[in-house]
């Protein structure tokens, strides 16, 4: 889902984990001009999902203004990708200082499929904005999505777990694997 920008940034610092400072209040802004209808609620669900997984190690908070936001989420034509995240590391502290998240807004499929793709892509890209790298485990939201059909297979597997579209991003269908939660908590406990 993510492009080379986040992978290179995370790989460039093998000695020190890339993350936000302890107990950070991370302000997230969603560009309303670019968001498809209903996308804001799905991004909100992704924020709540990561907040629950963090258990107070940080707080992602929706912000009404881009000027005071550390993470900016925008939607755009995807050109073959679902999303991309570009974190910026603060040279003085070594912590993430800000991140730009881009999510595909031009999606095919029925309304439920579009909601699934937006939610899971937001969850994946926000995971990168928090400092999580790709994994090789298909069940993880941070899976690397290397094969051409990985996205369709992953989104299809998630859809089969839903009882209805209202389950998207619910406690019953967070989209996070136990390994995703463990990786996040380990990153912020270290």
Put a short name on every predicted segment.
Residues 1-38, 47, 84-92, 176, ...:
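Disordered inhibitory propeptide/activation segment of secreted metzincin zinc metalloprotease zymogens
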Residues 20-35, 96-105, 160-167:
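Acidic/histidine-rich, surface-exposed loop or edge segments in extracytoplasmic proteins
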Residues 39-140, 146-150:
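Metzincin-family zinc-dependent endopeptidase catalytic domain
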Residues 138-190:
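Extracellular (secreted or membrane-anchored) zinc-dependent metallopeptidases
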């Amino acid at each position: 889902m993510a492009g080379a920008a986040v992978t290179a940034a995370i790989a460039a610092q093998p000695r020190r984990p890339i993350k936000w400072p302890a107990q950070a209040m991370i302000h997230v802004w969603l560009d309303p001009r670019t968001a498809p209808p209903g996308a804001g609620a799905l991004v909100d669900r992704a924020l709540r999902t990561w907040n629950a997984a963090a258990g107070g190690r940080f707080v992602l908070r929706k912000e009404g203004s881009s000027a005071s936001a550390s993470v900016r989420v925008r939607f755009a034509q995807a050109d073959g990708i679902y999303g991309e995240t570009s974190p910026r590391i603060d040279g003085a502290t070594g912590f993430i200082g800000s991140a730009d998240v881009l999510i595909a807004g031009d999606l095919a499929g029925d309304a439920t499929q579009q909601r699934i793709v937006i939610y899971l892509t937001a969850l994946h890209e926000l995971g990168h904005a928090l400092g999580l790298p790709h994994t090789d485990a298909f069940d993880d939201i941070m899976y690397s999505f290397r094969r051409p059909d990985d996205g369709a297979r992953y989104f299809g597997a998630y859809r089969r777990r839903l009882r209805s579209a209202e389950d998207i991003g619910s406690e019953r269908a967070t989209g996070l694997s136990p390994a995703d939660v463990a990786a996040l908590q380990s990153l912020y406990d270290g």
